Amino acid sequence: MAPSAISTSPPPTDRVSSSLASYKGYDHVHWYVGNAKQAASYYITRMGFKRIAYRGLETGCRSVCSHVVRNGDITFILTSPLRSLDQVDRFPPEEQELLKEIHAHLEKHGDGVKDVAFEVDSVDSVFYAATNNGAKIVSQPRTLEDDNGQVRVATIQTYGETTHTLVERGSYHGAFLPGYRMETGVEDPISQLLPGVHLNRIDHCVGNQDWDEMDKVCEYYEKALGFHRFWSVDDKQICTEYSALKSIVMASPNEVVKMPINEPAKGKKQSQIEEYVDFYNGAGVQHIALLTDDIIRDITNLKARGVEFIKVPDTYYEDIKVRLKKAGLTLHEDFETIRSLDILIDFDEGGYLLQLFTKHLMDRPTVFIEIIQRHNFSGFGAGNFKSLFEAIEREQALRGNLV
């Protein structure tokens, strides 16, 4: 189904966007978690990531620890505090502030995404264009250095307590960043016993907002970061009997970075967006979509590794089969295999996408992962939103949150 609200406006051509046409894609996603070692183990054992870098006591970092894992070009940093709040006075001011920040983030949000980092050609041009147009500074541009070269970084604020770090790698040839011990080649023994998961890159990263906050956030991306409105749907298109939402996808000038922004809309009961904002205690990253070139292989293997996905009712496939036949569209993949794996299908006259969503990654019903495969289709599954919402509402009802 082609979304009826795709933006027809071209990317902005003012001085902001011209300074920002240097986005290269997502660099990494930084999570604050209660136990980084265990969280890293989850992504390694369940989702086929590999350990690539570490920072902690053994590297001279006495206040926090970080485990870095990667699958394809998808990199997650998982960071935890090593000390309690009553011990912060032992550390220099910068480390004190970091410890306080992590503890406060965990107390307020639970495990969640703190930073979505973008790789850029020039940190300085993106940073100063952003800050000159209203972006809040978290950290000024600075250069990190080790034997593998230099990396330039800077950080700005986005919605809620989430941030965007800008990363300029230049000729740096280390596995991750200066300050981390490289662990490439460190193979988890369990990887020899489990089927492989071969993901490509981050496709998009979705942020949930509270009531009436979406437009303000989108305007911030337009003004400060030079993004443009790539795609949008309203509550008439994304609704069930009980709940609804609105969504606008913001894209970088060259469209290599896409950041969908959601907000709740009026319905009979609490929507999944309201549930998220309630349990996350504010705006934040709802899910990260990971692109694959073989979703059947990867969903099959993720399920074999124990990853839990939402369940799609059989009636969905009876309906989609009729719609596909009417449109004269033939899938490259076997339809019955797609049905058996609960994979969702959306399409238009040009192509189609296949997607499936995990259940929430933690006990708080906040963050989850999407696995997505695209066949000449740049949309975001508008045709699946009703089925997806209904599946999520069934989970909400089990949690007692569909009220």
From Swiss-Prot:
One of the Pfam families matching this protein, by short name: Glyoxalase
Annotated keywords: Dioxygenase, Iron, Metal-binding, Oxidoreductase, Phenylalanine catabolism, Repeat, Tyrosine catabolism
The record's comment on cofactor binding reads:
Binds 1 Fe cation per subunit.
Q: Which coenzyme or cofactor does it need? A: Fe cation
Q: Does the keyword Isomerase apply?
A: no
Question: What is expression of this protein induced or repressed by?
Answer: Expression is induced by L-tyrosine. Expression is positively regulated by the cluster-specific transcription factor hmgR.
The family database entries (PROSITE patterns) matched by this protein are listed as: VOC (PS51819)
Q: Which residues form the VOC domain?
A: 25-169, 201-359
Q: Keyword Glycosyltransferase on this protein?
A: no
User: What S-S linkages are listed for this chain?
Assistant: none
Reactions that this protein is recorded to catalyse: 3-(4-hydroxyphenyl)pyruvate + O2 = homogentisate + CO2
Pathway annotation from the record: Amino-acid degradation; L-phenylalanine degradation; acetoacetate and fumarate from L-phenylalanine: step 3/6
Name one process (GO BP) from the record.
tyrosine catabolic process
- Which annotated residues bind Fe cation? H204, H287, E370
- The enzyme's E.C. designation: 1.13.11.27
- Mind listing the GO molecular function terms for this protein? 4-hydroxyphenylpyruvate dioxygenase activity; metal ion binding
What does a knockout show?
Impairs growth on L-tyrosine as the sole carbon source and affects homogentisic acid and pyomelanin formation. Leads to increased sensitivity to reactive oxygen intermediates.
InterPro entries assigned: 4OHPhenylPyrv_dOase, 4OHPhenylPyrv_dOase_C, 4OHPhenylPyrv_dOase_N, Glyas_Bleomycin-R_OHBP_Dase, Glyas_Fos-R_dOase_dom, VOC
Entry's family note: Belongs to the 4HPPD family.
This chain's function reads: 4-hydroxyphenylpyruvate dioxygenase; part of the L-tyrosine degradation gene cluster that mediates the biosynthesis of the brownish pigment pyomelanin as an alternative melanin. The 4-hydroxyphenylpyruvate dioxygenase hppD catalyzes the conversion of 4-hydroxyphenylpyruvate to homogentisic acid (HGA). The protein hmgX is crucial for this conversion and thus, probably functions as an accessory factor to mediate specific activity of hppD. The homogentisate 1,2-dioxygenase hmgA is then involved in the cleavage of the aromatic ring of HGA and its conversion to 4-maleylacetoacetate.
**What quaternary structure, including any partners, is listed in this protein's UniProt entry?**
Homodimer.
Per its record, how is this protein called by name? 4-hydroxyphenylpyruvate dioxygenase
